[in-house]
Structure formats: structure tokens, C-alpha cells
């Protein structure tokens, strides 16, 4: 294990917000990071930014005090996926994900690849059904059950493989907590504060609704990154969550 490893998998902040850092420009992404407090959120680096700027972007965010969710959705043969997950752990990310449809052998190999990292291993979660997909999209690829049924099936498989949780729609959260237990982490995209544009997400929910449903970490992008005052927007969302919890 290298000195790049930054935090243990429990993380060090209590905020449930993960901001999707979806920029095509590194300077713009870092400028955004400099405008928000790392105690208020974690940051998600996805395929576009990681392809453009690589591991150094993650290191730059770590240097600013942020915990990073590396959202690359690995889906390959077991050995290749395991090596990729181990590389993410070496980089020191807080969370990394794979596609549950890669199957039991792939997910088990990924989990075993993190054993040498002990308490410093990132959270390992699996993607169930993309929040942009509805029943028609599933039928197009030969899956003739509802998104909720498919998400539950894949969440059970993920739990059986010993992973930490799944990426899912907030609409499946209550059921998945019942099936997989309270310790099974639920990470949900498609979260939009009241009044925000839904964008390309079809199955959306507000932050307050997501927390009430049992979501552990909510991914929010443009409503925060495109805000004139992203730090205020973050604070407002956190305040609404605290108010809703009372």
C-alpha cells in the first residue's frame, strides 16, 4: 500500500452529499472545489474527467481536503476488475464502484483485491439500474422485470458478495434497506433540490425525501455546480436535511 492512501472507508465527514464534479475543464473543476468546504460534501469524479485528467485530478482534490468517490463503474473480467479496484485503493479514494451485472465472480474478486488495504480500503459499491433507465429501457436489453425488481435482484447479489452497498434510485431505498439491512450503504443519483431541472434523470427525488427513504449518500450535480453560490446552496441543502430530521 502506498502513501497515497488517504482515509479509512468510514470517511471523516458526516455530510451525505456527494457533488458530481462533471466538468470538461480541470481548472473549472478545481475552481469549484476552492469555493466549497470539504466538510460539507464529498466529490465524485466520473469517466469524462478521469479520462481527461487522470489520477492527478484526484490527488489535487485530496490536497484540498476532499474525499473522492471514483465513479468509473468497472465492468470487466474478474482479474481486470480486481486490479482496477486495487489501483483505485492505491490512489486513496473514499469510494469506488463496479457494475453488479458483472456477476458474482467479478464482484467477489474486486472485494478480495481490497483485503490488503484493511481499514484503509475504500467503500466498494455496485451499480444496479442506472437512474436514467425505465422499464422500456430494460425491455430493450432483454430484461422483462421492473427497474425496482432488477435493482433488488442485483442488490441481493451485491450483498451476497460482501460489498458495502449499491448505487440505486432513491425510490428503491426503503425496500433495499429491508432486504439487505441498515448497514448496507445506498448511494443515489437523481437527487434534485425542490425546483431544480430534472436533466436526463428520470427517477428523481428531493434530498429530504431521499434521507427519509433511507439513502446514505446522495449524488447532486448541476444544482450545486451551476449555482451562482455553490457553498450557500450546499449549506441550504444541509440545513433542510437537519430541519427534516427534527
UniProtKB/Swiss-Prot annotation:
What enzyme class is recorded for this protein?
A: lyase
Query: Could you tell me what reaction this enzyme catalyses?
Result: orotidine 5'-phosphate + H(+) = UMP + CO2
Q: What is its EC number?
A: 4.1.1.23
Q: Which NCBIfam families match?
A: PRK00230.1, pyrF
GO biological process terms, semicolon-separated: 'de novo' pyrimidine nucleobase biosynthetic process; 'de novo' UMP biosynthetic process
Q: What's this protein's function?
A: Catalyzes the decarboxylation of orotidine 5'-monophosphate (OMP) to uridine 5'-monophosphate (UMP).
Question: Could you state one GO cellular component term attached to this entry?
Answer: cytosol
> Which cysteines in this chain are paired by disulphide bridges?
none
What's the source species for this entry?
Yersinia enterocolitica serotype O:8 / biotype 1B (strain NCTC 13174 / 8081)
Q: Name one GO molecular function term.
A: orotidine-5'-phosphate decarboxylase activity
Recorded name of the encoding gene: pyrF
Which superkingdom heads the taxonomic lineage of this protein's source?
Answer: Bacteria
Give the pathway listed in the UniProt entry for this protein.
Pyrimidine metabolism; UMP biosynthesis via de novo pathway; UMP from orotate: step 2/2
Q: Which UniProt keywords apply?
A: Decarboxylase, Lyase, Pyrimidine biosynthesis
Keyword flag Lyase: yes
Q: Which family does it belong to?
A: Belongs to the OMP decarboxylase family. Type 1 subfamily.
User: Which residues bind substrate per the record?
Assistant: 22, 44, 71-80, 131, 192, 201, 221-222
Give the multimer and partner information. Answer: Homodimer.
What is the active site of this protein?
Answer: 73 (proton donor)
Q: What is this protein called?
A: Orotidine 5'-phosphate decarboxylase
The record's section on InterPro entries has:
Aldolase_TIM, OMPdecase, OMPdecase_AS, OMPdecase_bac, OMPdeCOase_dom, RibuloseP-bd_barrel
